[in-house]
Amino acid sequence: MLTLTSYFGFLLAALTITPALFIGLNKIRLI
């Protein structure tokens, strides 16, 4: 149960951080 929760938490964090980094890189390239 704990491993499943941590796995979903990690997946959610990855889905949240990855687009943020992608947008950040795009903004840096635009500037």
UniProtKB/Swiss-Prot annotation:
GO biological process, one term: photosynthesis
Domain of life, per lineage: Eukaryota
Locations listed in the record: Plastid, Chloroplast thylakoid membrane
Assigned GO CC terms: chloroplast thylakoid membrane; cytochrome b6f complex
Membrane topology according to the record: Single-pass membrane protein
Role summary: Component of the cytochrome b6-f complex, which mediates electron transfer between photosystem II (PSII) and photosystem I (PSI), cyclic electron flow around PSI, and state transitions. PetL is important for photoautotrophic growth as well as for electron transfer efficiency and stability of the cytochrome b6-f complex.
Subunit text: The 4 large subunits of the cytochrome b6-f complex are cytochrome b6, subunit IV (17 kDa polypeptide, PetD), cytochrome f and the Rieske protein, while the 4 small subunits are PetG, PetL, PetM and PetN. The complex functions as a dimer.
Annotated protein name in UniProt: Cytochrome b6-f complex subunit 6
Gene: petL
